[in-house]
Amino acid sequence: GTRRWYGNNSNVVFWKNNGEAIHRCEGSVFRNSDFYFKSGITWSGISNSGSTFRMCPDGYLFDSNKGPMIFESSTDLNYLIALLNSKISAFYISMLNPTLSLQLGNVVSIPVVGEMNAKHDCVLELARNNISLCQRDWDSFETSWDFTTHPLVKLKMASANPWGNNNESAIRLST
């Protein structure tokens, strides 16, 4: 599915001994390994529902099917993901590449206004909030590696005790 800001982390790579088993596979190619396991911004390589950009934290790999990644300092990543998920970037992308396959070259062609922007700090805060909200949403599904409890179970547990207290008070008042 299409997710914006965070998520779609679904595959596990057996990386024991620096990927030794994968290195032994005929035809395996390792490119840009200096960037492996570093945080960045990624997107689906092919999409028919528009481009959506997601934060990919430390500890992940990237490939051409999931989409390339952009690596910057963490502040720049938050600013960039806000820009990339904006309507203006969607417009630029539709002009630069009106196909289903979004390439890194198209993404880096989007003009970026840095800290000269008066709203820079506000944009950073909104981006961090969006990433946090989307991470909580992603982690509320069993497909997330960080899933613990479904949110409805938490809601039921939180609401069960006040309901019991209210009923107990009502019963005392009626007797």
Q: What feature does the model see in each segment?
A:
Residues 1-62:
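Segments forming glycine/polar-rich beta-alpha architectures that bind adenosine-containing cofactors
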Residues 30, 99-100, 160:
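Hydrophobic alpha-helical segments
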Residues 109-175:
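Non-catalytic DNA-recognition/assembly elements of restriction-modification systems
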Residues 6-8, 94-95, 135-137, 142:
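Short, solvent-exposed loop/turn and secondary-structure capping segments
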Residues 17-20, 85, 89, 128, ...:
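Generic surface-pattern signal
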Residues 1, 20-23, 65-70, 165-175:
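Charged, low-complexity surface segments at secondary-structure and domain boundaries
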Residues 34, 44-109, 116-119, 133:
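Basic, amphipathic alpha-helical recognition segments used for DNA target recognition
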